[in-house]
Amino acid sequence: MKIIGLTGGSGTGKGTVAARMRALGAGWVDADAVYRTLCAENREMLSALDTAFGGVTDANGVLDRPKLAKIVFSDPAKLQQLNEITTPYIRKASLDAIHAQSACPIVLYDAPTLFEAGADDFCDKIIAVLAPHDTRVARIIERDGLSDEA
């Protein structure tokens, strides 16, 4: 099994590349989906986030993602702290998901922050998907149903 890292910014076309390779039999793991699952299910990680950022989970232990985003995206040090907490969990869960597809000759690891997270170290090859800024903006507007002003 070969692991191919797939990276690029929002709207570059990573999803299109992944869909075409999956149609040819490649496996696929989406780092963003792994993170969302961890946010919903991993009590240890949620507890660490709640301790670090003070009250970002409710009484049922559900993560308040907008509250966490407001904290970390307004302070680069807090964003780094978030990444330091979550990266080991994302890495382990991603590798587990990749190895669960070991029957596939190729598994794509779709991670927008592949290099920043150090995930390139377990990839055999890397594909960086690029697109002009205007194209990316147009795709995001269409994909997310946004207005031009958004």
Question: Could you say what each language-model-derived stretch is?
Answer:
Residues 15:
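Walker A/P-loop
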Residues 94-101, 106-142:
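ATP-dependent NMP and nucleoside kinases share a basic, alpha-helical "lid"
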Residues 12:
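ATP-binding Walker
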Residues 9, 21:
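P-loop (Walker A) phosphate-binding loop of NTP-binding proteins
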Residues 33-105, 150:
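ATP-dependent small-molecule kinase phosphotransfer cores
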Residues 4-6:
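Hydrophobic anchor at the beta1->P-loop junction of P-loop NTPases
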